[in-house]
Amino acid sequence: MTRLLFVAILFTLLLAACAGSRAPATSSQPAKVSVPGGSYTNVSATQLKAMLDKKDFTFVNVHIPYEGEIAKTDAFVPYNEIENNLGKLPADKNAKIVLYCRSGRMSAIAAKTLVRLGYTNVWDMEGGMIAWETLGLPLKTK
């Protein structure tokens, strides 16, 4: 019986260790994400709001289909058509580009693509427009 109890406790601890969840970033500092070919920077909706007050970057919505936009968006480039739309992005691969989508999934894919293409100053808004709206911030529609 003791052996069975020991195995049950061990199994429970193992499950608990493997079931960890990724908590949302709460740091006040953007976080670097390493990917093949370099890295990009994750930024929260709160951090992006402050960045937009002194905008010094190209702001790109990569979500498809169109579901709205954040004010001051410079371009719309579908996340899966980045390579075919480089003309909509800065020619300078060191220029700061901030990406967003609806939830963060598409923009993360786009960020990895830009890094693979040699862009060195790529930023991705975690949580996308959903995180933006959660803060009570508005979206625009065409």
Feature-to-residue mapping (PLM):
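Rhodanese-like catalytic fold shared by cysteine-dependent sulfurtransferases
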Residues: T2-A8, L13-F57, I64-K96, R105-K142
